[in-house]
Amino acid sequence: MNILENINTEKRNPRSLNLDSMSIAEAVSLMIDEEYGVIEALKEQHRNITEVILATSYSLRNGGRIIYIGAGTSGRLGILDAVECPPTFSVDYNTIVGLIAGGEKAFIQAQEGAEDAANFGKEDLQSINLTAKDIVIGIAASGRTPYVIGALEYANSIGATTVAISCTKQAKISKYAKYSIEAVPGPEVLTGSTRLKAGTTQKLILNMISTLSMVSVGKVYQNLMVDVKPTNQKLIERSKNIICEVTGVDYTTAEKFYLKANKSVKVAIVMILNNCDYEKALAILKNNNNFIKS
């Protein structure tokens, strides 16, 4: 039985049949043109993406976590998105978690066969003490990865919300999830190499999930990352510039309040806008569910 026969990501792209005889310039043009399929795939899934973000936002507001889980490129993309959230939004590293078949070492070196064991998906979720408050997002371009299916089955069994993200229609993993996103950008230029368009598609979906979920819990004011964690000189300067941008104060004043606010951009802004001290600013934010109210 050919288990890959009807999977979109395994189909040949008629536009790249002569890839091996194209000039580099021709191949570059082709690969650029092929990326347009990514945007069309995302537009077609607008409603489903929206539903997923509403679900992830609900989970975060109610004490849950977002758990990405996948194998290979899909797993790496989940980790990549997850690890960027603490410095960008000052969330705990346990708020958005990325899990990959084969463990952390699989991020830099393929672990043969890890994705084929459904029980590994279950065990990885058990290792982080998954609860019913969490939302598990299974990612598999092919839509059939056993590791992901095992994870979704376990998540369902304990009452956690489940999501399946794939790049093929009628994906097998969709059957194991409450919500599904089947964004199909078309066959790859290099047949079956889902690190290409499928990977780009998945990354953009994860970008939307994490960013807009953070917006929903007050981590953003207007379009500014007011909960940025100042972990390097660039982010320290960005923090001060954000304070200037929102409040209209000069750089020196922004720097003074930044230090008074214990290097919290959000608290500094509230202190300036409300002409109050640090403790009062914290109380105002708590009363507003951690949102800056203009």
From Swiss-Prot:
- Catalytic positions are E84, E115
Under catalytic activity, the entry for this protein gives: N-acetyl-D-muramate 6-phosphate + H2O = N-acetyl-D-glucosamine 6-phosphate + (R)-lactate
Matches recorded under CDD domains: SIS_Etherase
What EC numbers are recorded for this enzyme?
A: 4.2.1.126
Q: Please indicate if the UniProt record lists 4Fe-4S as a keyword.
A: no
Keyword set includes Signal: no
Q: Which family does it belong to?
A: Belongs to the GCKR-like family. MurNAc-6-P etherase subfamily.
Q: What does this protein do?
A: Specifically catalyzes the cleavage of the D-lactyl ether substituent of MurNAc 6-phosphate, producing GlcNAc 6-phosphate and D-lactate. Together with AnmK, is also required for the utilization of anhydro-N-acetylmuramic acid (anhMurNAc) either imported from the medium or derived from its own cell wall murein, and thus plays a role in cell wall recycling.
Name by which UniProt lists this protein: N-acetylmuramic acid 6-phosphate etherase
Species annotation: Francisella tularensis subsp. holarctica (strain LVS)
The lineage is:
Bacteria, Pseudomonadati, Pseudomonadota, Gammaproteobacteria, Thiotrichales
Gene transcribed to yield this protein: murQ
